[in-house]
Design a protein with these regions (language model features):
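Conserved non-catalytic scaffold segment of RNase H-like nuclease domains
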Residues: 2-138, 194, 199-201
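Short aromatic/hydrophobic-glycine micro-motifs
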Residues: 91, 146, 202-206
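Acidic, Mg2+-coordinating catalytic module of metal-dependent nucleases/exonucleases
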Residues: 119-136, 140, 175-253
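Short alpha-helix plus adjacent loop in nuclease-associated cores
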Residues: 157-184
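A short, structured active-site edge motif that brings together acidic residues
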Residues: 50-54, 150-167
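Substrate-recognition/cap helix-loop segment adjacent to the acidic, metal-dependent catalytic center
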Residues: 132-155
Length: 253
């Protein structure tokens, strides 16, 4: 990519990030799980996901929260004809209440981490992160913490937009920066072009077989972050870019 040099420590050290939400409406929907896969020299060294327990927050309409989560689960697990998709959605109202952490504390921890990542010269990897995860996270930081942390150009590598560009034959322009490229690809409707992480990109590249992946765990934030890492490493391998040390892959961490 033109302006690849803007990614600091590229492509060795980064944090793959994913979120699960109650829907796609920024300013309305809530982040209910944040997951990450931290990578050093191309190898995953830490993977974790945290549920955000909005059930204990008085300002949140609990009936709305339960209904939104039930709707997301239905949309993931059943198609428009009501037939099972074979997919699973793992975030429920009861799980938030039983296993979730204080959402403000979780958001604060991740915002502080992102600030440190910027200072340390790492970058983020996410699937559709340019249009969805990054702005959704920044919106939550702004609303619930009163502090912005917008992702800067060259701080996020969007595997979703790379996959979409590959399938839609969208090339780079000489003046492209990472963000301008991801923005431009994101605006293209490209009817019929598939690039979803679990439903297309991972199986299309045979990564579910190569890494013996349990795809029933997709739509869990930490697992999807790990899938983003594997897809990013696949792009590096395909481009002939090699990392120092042993190749990434193998069993999930």
């Amino acid at each position: 990519m033109a302006a690849t040099h803007k990614f600091r420590n590229f492509p060795c050290d980064y944090l793959a990030v994913d979120i699960e939400t109650t829907g796609v409406e920024k300013g309305l929907d809530l982040i209910v799980q944040i997951g990450h896969c931290a990578v050093v020299n191309g190898l995953p060294v830490d993977r974790s996901g945290t549920l955000l327990d909005w059930t204990a927050v008085p300002s949140i309409d609990q009936r709305w929260l339960a209904d939104r989560l039930a709707l997301v689960k239905k949309r993931v697990e059943f198609d428009r004809q009501g037939q099972p998709t074979g997919k699973h959605y793992h975030v429920t109202y009861d799980r938030l209440r039983a296993e979730g952490a204080d959402p403000i504390a979780v958001l604060r921890a991740y915002r502080d981490w992102f600030v440190k990542i910027r200072a340390d010269g790492l970058f983020l990897v996410s699937h559709n992160g340019n249009q969805f995860d990054a702005p959704f996270l920044n919106g939550a930081f702004s609303v619930f913490l009163g502090e912005d942390h917008p992702v800067l150009d060259g701080e996020l590598f969007d595997t979703g937009m790379v996959e979409k560009a590959l399938r839609g034959n969208l090339g780079l322009w000489a003046e492209d920066t990472p963000k301008s490229f991801f923005d431009r690809v994101g605006r293209q409707p490209l009817k019929g072009v598939r690039w979803a992480l679990d439903a297309f990109a991972i199986p299309q590249h045979g990564l579910h077989v190569k890494h013996a992946l349990d795809m029933s765990l997709a739509h869990t934030a930490d697992y999807d972050a790990y899938l983003c890492h594997l897809l990013f490493q696949h792009y590096l391998d395909e481009s002939g870019r090699r990392l120092p040390g042993p190749a990434a892959g193998g069993a999930a961490v």
